[in-house]
């Protein structure tokens, strides 16, 4: 499941990029969270991303990370080898000219590896749209496939409300609340939230520290190791934009 700790850095660079440019980032995090859930069983991740932004507003990009949530479920009888997430996306962003920005696109989450017979593949395709105004962004993502391996979960959706504001030169307050609706899967829907700060440095470096939590069901979101992946946690992110 794709992060938005790492991909947010790429997104921010894209917003500030000159006309028709290639931008990218690489981030290191102490735990990869996606929509509040640990994807690496509380272990570090390295997350590179690259994006091409056309002067017209069209863009295309790719992003990746190591993961463990799939291989953590592997058994001798049902072996799962996937340990990498590769994401591909394209879209169009612009402004209405009144300070209101918009962004629409399609996002593919891909997890290469081997899976046992009958295992619902985690590959997920979402379309998304967002509106932004003065640091506030409202985004909706809609899955046209099963959602990250949940059987019969097509047309699940995620609502994301965030507020990011620079409160001092180089310092940004980051807040977010979201809700994941998982269709046809009892107990799988949940909400998540965060509050954090980002410090920007010269030459594209930045450091972020955030507090994250969810109300995800322990019975649904406890992995094979007995770890509840929706617990409250702190995330440290070191990133470099280029």
Region locations from a protein language model:
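Cleavable N-terminal export/targeting peptides
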Residues: 1-21
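Short glycine/proline- and aromatic-enriched beta-strand/turn motifs that initiate or cap beta-hairpins
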Residues: 15-70, 233
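Residues that define the transmembrane beta-barrel architecture of outer-membrane proteins
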Residues: 20, 42-46, 82-86, 100, ...
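Repeated loop/turn-to-beta-strand initiation elements of outer-membrane beta-barrel proteins
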Residues: 22, 56-62, 98-102, 135-140, ...
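Transmembrane beta-strands of outer-membrane beta-barrel pores
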Residues: 28-34, 54, 64-68, 94, ...
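Surface-exposed loop and membrane-interface regions of Gram-negative outer-membrane beta-barrel proteins
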Residues: 38, 58-121
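Structural signature of outer-membrane beta-barrel channels/translocons
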Residues: 51-57, 91-95, 130-136, 164-166, ...
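Outer-membrane beta-barrel "beta-signal"
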Residues: 195, 199-205, 227-242
């Amino acid at each position: 499941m794709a992060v938005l700790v790492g991909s947010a850095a790429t997104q921010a660079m894209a917003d500030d990029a000159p006309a028709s440019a290639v931008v990218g980032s690489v981030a290191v995090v102490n735990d990869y969270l996606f929509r509040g859930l640990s994807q690496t069983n509380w272990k570090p991740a390295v997350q590179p991303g690259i994006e091409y932004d056309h002067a017209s507003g069209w863009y295309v990009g790719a992003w990746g990370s190591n993961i463990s949530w799939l291989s953590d479920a592997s058994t001798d009888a049902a072996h799962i080898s996937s340990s990498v997430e590769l994401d591909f996306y394209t879209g169009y962003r612009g402004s209405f000219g009144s300070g209101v920005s918009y962004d629409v696109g399609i996002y593919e989450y891909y997890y290469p590896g081997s899976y046992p017979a009958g295992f619902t593949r985690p590959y997920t395709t979402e379309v998304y749209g967002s509106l932004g105004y003065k640091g506030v962004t409202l985004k909706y993502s809609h899955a046209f496939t099963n959602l990250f391996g949940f059987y019969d979960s097509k047309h699940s959706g995620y609502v994301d409300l965030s507020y990011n504001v620079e409160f001092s030169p180089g310092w940004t307050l980051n807040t977010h609340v979201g809700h994941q609706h998982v269709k046809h899967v009892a107990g799988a829907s949940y909400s998540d939230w965060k509050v954090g700060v980002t410090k920007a440095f010269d030459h594209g470096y930045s450091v972020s520290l955030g507090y994250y939590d969810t109300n995800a069901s322990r019975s649904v979101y406890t992995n094979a190791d007995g770890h509840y992946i929706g617990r409250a946690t702190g995330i440290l992110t070191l990133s470099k934009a280029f």
